[in-house]
A protein has these predicted regions:
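Hydrophobic positions on the alpha1 helix immediately C-terminal to the Walker A/P-loop
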Residues: 29, 33
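Structural recognition of the conserved hydrophobic beta-strand(s) that form the central parallel beta-sheet
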Residues: 85, 110-116, 137
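Pre-Walker A adenine-sensing motif
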Residues: 1-11
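Interdomain motor-coupling "hinge/lid" segment immediately C-terminal to the ATP-binding subdomain
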Residues: 122-242
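Conserved lysine of the Walker
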Residues: 26
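Accessory nucleic acid-recognition modules appended to NTPase machines
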Residues: 195-359, 363-366
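Conserved catalytic cores of phosphodiester-cleaving nucleases, focusing on short active-site segments
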Residues: 340, 360-379, 398
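Short glycine-rich substrate-engagement loop in P-loop NTPases that contacts/grips substrate
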Residues: 48-80
Length: 429
């Protein structure tokens, strides 16, 4: 919501495209933003409203378009006082292209659009209004937002204030809710179902419905020649993450598979917002981006709850502590990745050396510092790779996320997993 308010108040504001996977709550957040920040909202759904089907077909005359939207919605549209929302805009012919004319001819009007798979238009030069729009990315609910949904605002406040002394006293409760988050994830409908019923089976039903909707999107919207390959990559992710080093291996998708056969499939999943890609760096030096190796990467699911549903992981396995970490490392690393990615301006990579066992789960660039990161599912804090990295780089400070309490150990900081996002957000400011 804060990002939307900042967009509203920008002097150079342009029409807004809100990107994000299906069912992360884009429509809800735009309507709520309009309710809080504007006198009224003119909302149209371009997918199920026959009246708007030909809205942009005659021309891009903004005066005519505004009169039509006002007539359809019954809203008196006023510059700066009305939020115009066009939902599922990808279903409306020439809908995205119209944003160029709102930007050039009527910048005083506040226009926001959303839709499923809008990210796929980023590479469509014919319809995407390059340079004429602002974009924001929306992600599944973070762990902190999950806590708020569970009516735990004080626990969120303690994490955001970095009050680790008080956080320690609530350790058992934080861990309980974190394990719940591993099961439920951050898809708003799944979170709401859990809050209302506390029933893991009903949550799984919601998650399976979301996964089915994604499958339908793949078959309906992906290029016909890529549908099978996209499905193969998508279904391979749980197996990819179950491997010890999580690196994406094409042979796991299909025996004998090659990169060139699946590059477009992976890009489609990225553009649809269904996966996160974390590339390898081969050197721990600023800026990390110039040391990026795009051919070596990890693929994570957008949501750990959906990962559990797709992998058929029993809910009890996620809700209870494990003694051997089996089946937990993948969820834990996926969780940390999703919390990092929700901080959209935080560069995230992983690090490994050729012909070496040394590998760091993540490497982040926070301001002018390179921070190596290790992730531990429980409280086994042995971390040979991180220890070696810090020994070889005496000016570097390392991070370890685990179930243990916050503590400083020389140039290594242990942060409890439930405080990972709060800590990283503070670190990059």
């Amino acid at each position: 919501m804060d990002d939307l308010v900042r967009w509203k108040n920008r002097n150079d504001r342009k029409p807004l495209i809100l990107l994000g996977a299906r069912q992360v709550g884009k429509t809800y957040i735009l309507k709520e933003f309009g309710r809080r920040e504007y006198d009224n909202v003119a909302y149209i759904n371009c997918d199920n409203n026959a009246l708007v089907r030909d809205l942009f077909t005659p021309d891009y005359n903004i005066g005519r378009i505004l009169l039509t939207i006002g007539a359809i919605t019954g809203v008196n549209i006023q510059p700066g006082k009305t939020l115009i929302i066009m939902d599922e805009v990808q279903e409306l012919k020439r809908g995205l292209a119209s944003l160029k004319y709102f930007c050039e001819d009527a910048p005083q009007y506040h226009v926001a659009v959303a839709g499923s798979l809008l990210g796929l238009t980023l590479h469509d030069g014919d319809s995407y209004p390059v340079g004429k729009v602002n974009t924001l990315n929306m992600y599944p609910m973070t762990f902190e937002e999950f806590l708020l949904a569970r009516n735990r605002k004080q626990m969120v406040d303690l994490l955001q204030a970095q009050r680790w002394d008080f956080v320690k006293g609530l350790r058992t409760l934080y861990i309980q809710h974190l394990r719940e988050y591993y099961l439920v994830g951050g898809m708003p409908e799944a979170v709401d179902k859990f809050v209302q019923t506390n029933d893991a089976n009903l949550v799984r039903e919601v998650q399976n419905e979301i996964l089915a909707a994604y499958e339908k999107d793949i078959s309906k919207h992906a290029p016909a020649e890529q549908v099978m390959r996209i499905g193969q990559v998508w279904h391979s992710i749980p197996s990819q993450l179950a491997k010890e080093n999580r690196k994406f291996i094409y042979g796991v998708v299909k025996k004998g598979a090659r990169a060139k056969d699946y590059e477009l499939a992976i890009q489609w999943l990225l553009d649809a917002g269904l996966v996160y890609k974390v590339n390898r760096v081969t050197t721990l030096a600023m800026p990390l981006k110039i040391h990026e190796e795009i051919s070596a990467f990890k693929l994570f699911m957008l949501d750990c709850g959906l990962l559990g549903a797709m992998s058929l992981t029993p809910p009890a396995m996620l809700l209870l502590p494990s003694t051997d970490n089996s089946g937990k490392g993948d969820f834990t690393e996926n969780f940390v990745c999703s919390q990092m990615k929700s901080l959209s301006d935080l560069p995230v990579f992983y690090y490994s050396k050729d012909n070496s066992q040394l590998e760091l789960d993540f490497v982040v660039q926070a301001n002018t510092a390179v921070c190596p990161v290790e992730v531990k599912a429980e409280e086994n804090l042995q971390s040979k790779s991180l220890k070696t990295t810090l020994s070889e780089n005496p000016d570097m400070h390392g991070l370890r996320f685990s179930m243990s309490d916050y503590r400083e150990e020389g140039r290594l900081t242990n942060v409890p997993l439930y405080g990972a996002r709060s800590f990283l957000k503070a670190l990059k400011q």
